[in-house]
Amino acid sequence: LSGLARKIADDPELELQIIATNMHLSPEFGLTYREIERQGFRINRKVEMLLSSDTANATGKSVGLATIGFSDAYEDLAPDMLLVLGDRYEILAAVTAALFYKIPVAHLHGGEVTEGAYDDAIRHAITKMSHLHFTSTEEYRRRVIQLGEQPERVFHVGAIGIDNIRHIDLLDKKVLEEQLDFPFDRKTVLVTYHPETLDAIPTGEQFRNLLEALDDRQDIRI
């Protein structure tokens, strides 16, 4: 959101207010709110919500804490509109609180699908509490409309992350090898894992299955 935030901040007719929350405020995850400040933005409010546990009980409590924190923030900041992106549970808390304050919500990246995860339910709930919708593809625009949103309020604008890619200074291979201490001397594969949060199989077991499959590929560096 940094590029869009910059455009809002530079517009003389608009006032940007930033609320930082969740992992941005956690030492365990690097206190990344500092990255926001290093880009020259002022954080107007920090909403503490993250409990140091990944259980269902802790996550539910974190959502409750976030809803309280965002309510307090809206009471003080009195925003005219809330701009949110995606399907994180802290965003669900933010728009839930905004609903009762009658704050219009602009939602980016609605209508998308993440199979096997809580994300779909959260994302669609955010859509139903939002007033303006900016989707990354025409297919997702149609899905938002299928959820009952007014077509004239749903806009296919593309993925906002593309703007960031266009402005990134890419590292060359040698510099990247030095920074990662990882030689690219043969075919290399970057592997990421997104757990299926709705699956009855524990996440650890799912991940072990992935590692076992990768063990069979001795011809590549992972």
Q: Where are the model-predicted features located?
A:
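PLP-dependent amino-acid enzyme catalytic core
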Residues: 11, 45, 57-64, 68, ...
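Charged helix-capping and loop-helix junction motifs
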Residues: 119-121, 173, 203-211
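Conserved nucleotide-sugar phosphate-binding/catalytic loop shared by glycosyltransferases and other
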Residues: 14-62, 69
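A conserved nucleotide-sugar
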Residues: 13-15, 211-222
